[in-house]
UniProtKB/Swiss-Prot annotation:
Pfam families: Glyco_trans_1_4 (PF13692), Glyco_transf_5 (PF08323). Keywords: Glycogen biosynthesis, Glycosyltransferase, Transferase. Pathway: Glycan biosynthesis; glycogen biosynthesis. It comes from the Bacteria. This is Glycogen synthase. InterPro entries: GS/SS, Starch_synth_cat_dom. One of its GO terms (biological process) is glycogen biosynthetic process. It comes from Deinococcus deserti (strain DSM 17065 / CIP 109153 / LMG 22923 / VCD115).
Length: 446
């Protein structure tokens, strides 16, 4: 089985979030299971790594293109070099135009390299146009929605010329969406099968509450048997309390005490249990709910937050950091993130929606019990006998769940049992990788 993943980012070469993490882990596991796997992403000016150039030429209606290659963990990584991507950073305000250019270039380049896969697997809106052109060429395709909120939209009158799509695609039955070209919609309607990153999120996005305007398309896909959810896995080597160089090594609750003490020392915390947060500061992540809940949380918890994003949420947390039981580190710091996952007793994720979420899985692997809102992948991954779940997206519901966690913390046998169950959960990529390979087989033979 020859599989080609098409993505806008892939760890460790280019990463801004969870998409890059997924593409940095899933392909390698698929390769160990016998698939011949390649990953195609842009050759950014800020790319971490030095690909060997293996092809260069002019592509009709695109211009000069070059292709670089790196091999790692049994996977072939291909990097598509276009002038539009030679600037610093990954994402910019003109990304719809940039990824339209990318989308027009991919198939001609793959043909020039004689790289026609059995299955092309596109990820998120940046690959939507690639999936549409692959469909036009008769290729078999899978398309994964990692976050439906980001759809790649631009005024149709302007963007239609960028896409290279024929007139039928530029209608309401095609990729038109309220006067815009919608690249995610193009991928959804073109793919042989669509997945998203948890079974619960696959159900949620067919509703008006979570469908971001595309619920009609997604409901039709569900009724046709073309939409399903496959939970993301976790990089077991990168996130392993037994071997993590950033924390004292441990494999059980007794060993975890050293990591907790190290975190207390780092932030000058008192003896109250520690509620950790590692998150983008955004309303989607429920960080406004956390801030509103802080006046009550500090009665029972030390709260340690690592994250960056919304300026208003950042300013609010900076103000709260004057409180002796609230600590805030702005930005993203990989080593500190590991220390918070390991050293916290509980971990808060009050997300309004969460397609899959990795943080709750990391926390449980480190024996830190999640307090989560019942949405998306948080429902699929946090068992009620391990973590603490709440439904309404309100500060009051978050506080109540944290009170339940504190009560469990005071019951030593209950807490120890929950931690043991958390650390025994299997969040490896092996299961999801096998599910994707089985899906590819169905797509190819169907």
């Amino acid at each position: 089985m020859r599989v080609l993943h098409v993505t806008s980012e892939v760890f460790p070469f280019s990463r801004s979030g969870g998409l890059g993490d997924v593409l940095g882990a899933l392909p390698a596991v698929q390769a160990t299971l016998g698939a011949q796997v390649s990953v195609l992403s842009p050759w950014y000016g800020s790319l971490a790594g030095a690909p060997e150039q293996i092809w260069a030429g002019d592509v009709a209606d695109v211009g000069p293109v070059r292709v670089g290659e790196l091999r790692q963990d049994g996977v072939r990584f291909l990097f598509l070099g276009l002038p539009e991507f030679e600037r610093e950073g990954l994402y910019h305000p003109d990304d719809v135009w940039r990824f339209c250019t990318y989308g027009r270039a991919v198939l001609p380049v793959l043909r020039a390299l004689n790289e026609v896969p059995d299955v092309l697997h596109g990820h998120d809106w940046q690959a939507g146009l690639v999936v549409a052109h692959a469909h036009e060429a008769g290729w078999r395709t899978v398309y994964t929605v990692h976050n439906l909120q980001y759809q790649g939209r631009w005024n149709l009158a302007e963007a239609s010329g960028w896409s290279g799509l024929g007139p039928a695609w530029l209608t309401h039955e095609g990729a038109e969406f309220y006067g815009d070209l919608n690249l995610m919609k193009a991928g959804l309607i073109a793919a042989n099968h669509v997945t998203t990153v948890s079974p619960q999120y696959a159900r949620e996005i067919t509703t008006q509450q979570y469908g971001e305007g595309l619920q009609g398309v997604l409901l039709r896909l569900t009724l046709e048997g073309r939409l399903s959810g496959i939970i993301n896995g976790l990089d077991q080597e990168r996130w392993n309390p037994r071997t993590d160089p950033d924390v004292p090594a441990y494999s059980d609750l007794a060993g975890k005490a050293a990591a907790t003490q190290a975190l207390r020392t780092e932030f000058g915390l008192d003896k109250a249990p520690v509620l950790g947060v590692v998150s983008r500061l955004a309303d989607q992540k429920g960080m406004d709910l956390l801030i509103e809940a802080l006046p009550r949380l500090v009665h029972n918890w030390n709260v340690v937050v690592l994250g960056g994003g919304d300026p208003l949420l950042t300013a609010a947390l900076e103000g709260w950091a004057q409180h002796p039981r609230v600590s805030f580190a702005q930005g993203m710091n990989e080593a500190l993130a590991h220390q918070i996952y390991a050293g916290s007793d509980a971990f808060a994720m009050p997300s309004r929606f969460e397609p899959c979420g990795l943080s709750q899985m990391i926390a449980m692997r480190y024996g830190t019990l999640p307090v989560v809102r019942e949405t998306g992948g948080l429902v699929d991954t946090v068992p009620p006998d391990v973590g603490f779940r709440f439904q309404p997206a309100t500060p009051e519901a978050l506080v109540e769940a944290c009170q339940q966690a504190r009560a469990a913390f005071e019951d030593q046998s209950d807490w120890e049992a929950r931690v043991a169950r958390a650390m025994a959960l299997d969040f490896s990529w092996d299961g999801p990788a096998r599910e994707y390979l089985a899906l590819y087989e169905r797509v190819v033979t169907g």
